[in-house]
Amino acid sequence: MKKVNFTEMKKGTKKDYKILEKYDKKFERKTADRILKYLKSQTSTLEGYKITRLEHSLQAATRAFKNKESEEMVVATLLHDIGDDFAPMNHSQYAASIIKPYVSEKTFWIIHHHGLFQSYYSAHHLGGDRNARNKFKNHKYFKATINFCENYDQNSFDPNYKSMKLKQFAPMVKRIFSRKPFYFL
């Protein structure tokens, strides 16, 4: 394997960065595989709930698929809580940052804000403001985010629901993450 000559990026040459570009592209092509592997491992999280984190994601994505959402939205729904393990206080933003280069502004916004909107169902039971989402009431994706939470997220904790299998979503994930990125950084 070729390696760069620098120990500080400011001393890198065009040749060095061409070497890295080749490896970066190869790594980027495997993003979907790494995401699917991580999702598959989500079998022991969501303590206190009746289902696993993986099952919650599968239920939510199955509901989106059955509702004939775009493939982009189905994949975003599958990944909407992928940030819970690493960023429990801002999991929505974490998940949104993963999908941002490959999805529309609308899909990004929904996933980015779903955590706050989802608190509508629980905040008032814990001394919080269930209507905190209303600060976005004039935003063009406000209703779409409410619909996302109502139709796919808040109702996907059912141990008796028949979800699609992760392998059924795998080709969709691979197609979305093989798109030419809409955004970079």
Question: Language model features by range: what are they?
Answer:
Residues 1-78, 82-185:
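Metal-dependent phosphohydrolase cores
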